Amino acid sequence: NSTMRRKVEQEGYLQESSKAGLPSATTGFQKSSHLMAFAHNPPAGPLPGAGQAPLGSDYPYYHIAEPQNVPGQIPYPVALHVNIVNVPQPAAAAIQRHYNDEDPEKEKRIKELELLLMSTENELKGQQALPTQNHTANYPGWHSTTVADNTMTSGDNAPVSCLGEHHHCTPSPPVDHGTSEMMSYYMDTTIGSTGPYPLARPGVMQGASSCCEDPWMPCRLQSACCPPRSCCPPWDEAAIQEVPTGLEHYSTDMECADVPLLTPSSKEMMSQALKATFSGFAKEQQRLGIPKDPQQWTETHVRDWVMWAVNEFSLKGVDFQKFCMNGAALCALGKECFLELAPDFVGDILWEHLEILQKEEAKPYPANGVNAAYPESRYTSDYFISYGIEHAQCVPPSEFSEPSFITESYQTLHPISSEELLSLKYENDYPSVILRDPVQTDSLQTDYFTIKQEVVTPDNMCMGRVSRGKLGGQDSFESIESYDSCDRLTQSWSSQSSFQSLQRVPSYDSFDSEDYPAALPNHKPKGTFKDYVRDRADMNKDKPVIPAAALAGYTGSGPIQLWQFLLELLTDKSCQSFISWTGDGWEFKLSDPDEVARRWGKRKNKPKMDYEKLSRGLRYYYDKNVIHKTAGKRYVYRFVCDLQSLLGYTPEEHSSASGLTSSMACSSF
């Protein structure tokens, strides 16, 4: 604006209206006068002078008449009146000129100035007009419109302009869209101000032509009709500063993102991908000098390992303070305790890597001076207590870490094949521990620890014995008993089994190979389960026909699994009120699924177990072809595996046994 004003002054066309002190010269012209190439009728009164404030307003007022290309012959100007009173924003100069046929040179120069004005407004086109709320009762301002041909609506009855914003914005002044329609704006001096701000109440004429014919028109109208910045309420001005980017629709909390549930197939794929990724830890071990055996890790090594995993997999929410322990203590935690150190799924990744490292280190290898027939084995988190399997194993005393208690049952540590389990004798007078001939140790050092062998009987299935001493004699035994006694195992095969606190819940947050086998046992045990339970004299006759713990021992699956637990309930007469056979093969129905879930949670020591989590465990068996859901029936499932070959009796025999006492059922089989 300053540049244009100087240009106008240099050309001699800038004249202050206050110097004349007289009404505008426009009163002498009627049909031949033009306002910046707009045909118009003259205003009824003079424009406000530069030294006087506009009537009815507390703010200085400025008037703008915009240029418009109008086809046809235009008379030459005779005078140019410019009225500028305070310029609070761009393009706020009021230029009024009148034409006659005397000075064509001035007309040419004025057109050049118009082009300069248009180019300046083009640069300011990107600036948005300040939006204001349409409070017509508080803003005096543009009031009336005079239309020469009297064919258009004017004054207070004029509709709101269609240019600019549609909602809560400053309306734009009317635009002449044809040569036959003439219009001008002027200040209404007959209405006083009742508020502190100018009122924006424009008239609009709607011609037949489009309102977008002149590409410069929206920009000029916004520049001309926007009130000063000080007129805008503070909340509108704050809203102008906010530019929508679209990012506000996206959540920035990545930790709250839903994580898809793991399925058997997805877990297998994830395990394969993790194994390939874990291979990169070997370079980190060489760089930091971390031993390959996790048992030998120090606290620093454990911290470096966790740090590597966090960076490698972009893990979040890991509390490094919980991992302030050495490798031996870390490996001795067991999976359940280990998973409590890290958030969901994060602990699974760390545990998977730790297990891989332990399995790689636990691979047998020939020792110097030792016959390859007697491989040496390192101690790991399960201490590899061996029961009646192959030869005795030797470990150096420096690597021996004697546990204070055994936290897992015998079968959890070492799943034994059914051939070996069924080949054992169960006479009560059979010795619980059989020491084999000591290994010839001519070339071995004398200070070694040995793990003795024992044949497992029902009376000592939960008991492990570690012999400590020197090879070749002078053996001393230190018995380490698990928290469950053998009496409890033999006395209760139902829901109060000794395996109670050792099982894991088949919920969506933990898919464990122990709880969820790939299928039923790959090997076929010698004999059927019917023969297996018949030979067990210690079976409680008042308990279910198929105790889950006995079935787990028969199949060698380790911890009790959900399908085994369901079979136990289905053969227990006291449970027929909430789970029973339907009579159609191996199909069964959960009459009270909540009660089944409660008992499963009690068996697994998971008080928060409900049917939703139980059903997730059942769905796991769908892909394994163990249990399927019966379509169209609620809470009805079917065993699709070959239970008849496994158990030794038909579905009809099984269904009939449900209505008999346990002793009668056992005798009938």
UniProtKB/Swiss-Prot annotation:
The keyword DNA-binding applies. InterPro entries: Ets1_N_flank (IPR045688), Ets_dom (IPR000418), ETS_fam (IPR046328), Pointed_dom (IPR003118), SAM/pointed_sf (IPR013761), SAM_PNT-ETS-1 (IPR041886), Tscrpt_reg_Wos2-domain (IPR012642), WH-like_DNA-bd_sf (IPR036388). The keyword Zinc does not apply. Signal peptide: none annotated. Residues 1-27, 132-153 are annotated as: Disordered. It comes from the Viruses. Residues 276-361 form the PNT domain. Residues 1-10 have a biased composition (Basic and acidic residues). It is found in: Host nucleus. Residues 556-640 bind DNA. Keywords: DNA-binding, Host nucleus, Oncogene. GO terms for cellular component: host cell nucleus. One of its GO terms (molecular function) is DNA-binding transcription factor activity, RNA polymerase II-specific. Gene3D superfamilies: Transcription Factor, Ets-1 (1.10.150.50), Winged helix-like DNA-binding domain superfamily/Winged helix DNA-binding domain (1.10.10.10). Residues 90-142 are annotated as: Transcriptional activation domain. Changing H628D: In strain: mutant TS1. DNA-binding protein that specifically recognizes the sequence 5'-YAAC[GT]G-3'. The Myb-Ets protein induces predominantly erythroblastosis in chicken and transforms avian erythroblasts and immature myelomonocytic cells in culture. It appears that the Ets domain is responsible for the effects on erythroid cells and that the Myb domain encodes the myeloid-transforming capacity. This is p135Gag-Myb-Ets-transforming protein. It comes from Avian leukemia virus E26.
